[in-house]
């Protein structure tokens, strides 16, 4: 009988043999022009960004992450990478290759870094390190800047015999309640980098020994299919296609099926709202990403919790809901919910605010950075307060509209992809 350790070793030798000589997966992105954003941010800001990029012209940059689809990181890179190209930087986006075991381990690491009590065994560490070692072998080329996104590829640099260029680690989640054993394991690899990027200064752990730390919140692309303007007729057609009535109140949460996003709590909140607003509908939209093996299990749990209430709609990319459809549902909604228990930032909140929608969201992590309480939405604690605020907004359309208008302007000033591009250019120049 084979031991677990031997099975792991045989499995990874097989993967390495199959992939030796290959490269990391290169993600192709559609071209973008910075000039297309003139009407949104103004000519002066466009010129400022181009001037900032002059000293970086011809520099080679690569972004490395775990998936090309699903989740906020992939969405950000699909806009950021082509805009970096447009200002004269030679930039690539590459995705690591790994086994299902690896993604199960990194999901546990992700949960542990957000405070969940998860096992973290010697075998799990071995799976993590073997995959990072494999990806170091697949990583080819020389770059002036290498940007590593999140924990999955953080140890690639550990196996690099000769470090060339500046290596930057970008952390997208909230580690303030991280399990100590998991944080210590990851920290040793973070500290090999030249710089690290966090969403909030509160996310920077006191024991992190790294000279260069940048605070850069994420951002959205206002011209992407997920955020661009849509005609009312198109919105109506998309929503009705999924058997949601656009003429009745709609509350929506867009997030993965994940315990941290608390879809079960959202359903409980909706049931409280329905006692007051009888015709309300709930839409839960998720993208099922290939680095999220826990997603299916939690989808089934959510479906069981929803029961046979035909006013609860569980939608995902697997039944044809893509970026355009998410856009339409956000625009058709009366209130957007984000009832996360932990949230590094929550791009879907910024997306909703950009569409002029009031947001009711949990007062956790990076959410208060976006939701200015009582001005662009409501920050809430428990399910009862969440339901109370949703009912308030459904019954007072004037307040809802006022919050939505304020929210859009707040995003224009703080959370557009052009600001994120500028932040990266400043960081590269500083290194």
Where are these regions (language model features)?
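Conserved acidic donor-binding segment of nucleotide-sugar-dependent glycosyltransferases
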Residues: 373-384, 392-397
